């Protein structure tokens, strides 16, 4: 049963035309794929009322099998010079959308259902909508935000690597899209309106005016260097804006063995590299040392370790001293947490202790 008038009160020419398209899809489904069509919904500008004379009809045509793709088509009506694309969607497509990998969820969430043939499919749609609502309220959404920003960084790197203005603009588009999605999901929201209303929806969020201004400047720029500069600014703002500080644990017995690992993995290799004047090996081992301490400090309240700020590629022996100084600082952290560093005079002392202790 069609209830198209539930959200369209005035029977205008466009409404009649849209109704004819929907009726045609239903009739064709009964003829060529009677078991395929599950339901039809309307979303986009026609559903929100944000239409103009060239607005087309966005439909959620939910199908149950590949036979349903017979309903898909694209066409242009010459009397109004409007193009239409009739897409078909499977439940798996909606399930993917419900994971919130992006914030363009209006098709899933806001489609006005005007025809239902399979009640089970409609019930599944409602469950997916509930899932999205819960997800956008959950802490899990912040993982999606990070994933989107990581994708934005990849596209930013592409923009720095490409020379052609057109390609840099395409890279910029991907950066902007990922960042906009990230900011919306961060606030537990999704885009309900079309592209032309993007800044209206962003204006409802507590972001700085500079955020939207940067996007406007990027899309209006003819200079690759300017685009890259603005993209960097946009990315840094978005990353800081969406940063979710989590409470860090106090150092505890969980860190037992980490000091010995830091010593074993890289300390003597840094010294060897210095003796051999091997700048590359020294660099890699110091970075690895810094990386492990950074990983620990991201989980535990042990302070910051900016070792590579002090790294000296010109005098490698300095790096041995730097390594030992930071090791000493970390040993104090372990001692304060009641962690005893395992040191033995020789291998026999180790074996004896190793075999005696459980």
Can you say where each PLM-predicted feature lies in the sequence?
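Generic hydrophobic, helix-prone segments enriched in Leu/Val/Ile
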Residues: 10, 15-23, 120-128, 238, ...
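Conserved nucleotidyltransferase catalytic core and NTase-mimicking acidic/glycine-rich helix/loop elements
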Residues: 139-358
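Metal-dependent nucleotidyltransferase catalytic core
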Residues: 16-36, 41-55, 60-111, 304, ...
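Short N-terminal helix-initiation segments at or just after the protein's N-terminus
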Residues: 21-29, 114-122, 232-233
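Internal, well-ordered alpha/beta segment that forms a basic, Gly-enriched binding/recognition surface
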Residues: 89-154
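Glycine-centered small-residue hotspots that permit tight backbone geometry or close packing
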Residues: 34, 123, 208-209
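Helical scaffold of the NTase/Pol beta-like nucleotidyltransferase catalytic core
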Residues: 4-38, 336-358
